[in-house]
């Protein structure tokens, strides 16, 4: 196990190095000049050149990349071009809404989708199964921003049950915090619920067809005991895999969701940085999101051995 973890951590470092290079190269080649945006419309060429020199944008690509990597190795993600604040500080100010939204969505999605998938597999071919699968197809089909606007029009504007936008810290109370996250979580988590439900159902159907499950049923074990104690436990690995992969859905969906619901999170910060070509923020956020995704999938891989004794590292 230890050797496997060390090997995976080493590969994670390589992946993050490649991601860092690709992100920096893509932003370097992206059309547009942040110096011209900072200088304004009435700036002269000399003003723009002066800003280039100040930001180091007049240096060769490898020199800029090397300087950025050196700062990154010391925990410095750079400084925002427009606010002149450290990127780590800006991300720290915005991290609570994003973490609250993604964690709440993840927990609710797992709590809803796994039972739906199990019930659909146990009642395969019935109206209940067809209803669950129809919901899954619908969940995949509706884009996040479309569902978000439908929820806003229905529950925030027409019924006036929930706030349209904004965020309240959990320090202000659980209910105010939750009220501002219900609609964003539904909009963000619907496609995630649909995905996990389909995978859970397919994995359960495969396990329920195995001989050892039929043997357990023939011994007279209770249906719930067969489903939970035998079938679900052995079907857990594919479900855990899709949960880890789905983190990418949550991260990308959070950017859209935070923009629609005006949540002051990292996703909203990223959109603002893209519109202003604030490259240090874009680079820092991309690296952090990539690291979270890689580490979550590493944790999922390591947890396989906990649910399936046949897996050894």
Briefly describe each language-model feature range.
Residues 2-4, 13, 95-130, 144, ...:
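Alpha-helical transmembrane segments of integral membrane proteins
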Residues 15-66, 159-180:
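Hydrophobic alpha-helical transmembrane segments of membrane transport/permease proteins
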Residues 22-29, 59, 67-70, 134-165, ...:
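Membrane-water interface segments at the C-terminal ends of transmembrane alpha-helices
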Residues 36-38, 63, 78-81, 147-148, ...:
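Short, hydrophobic secondary-structure boundary micro-motifs
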Residues 58-114:
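An internal, D/E-rich "acidic patch" concept
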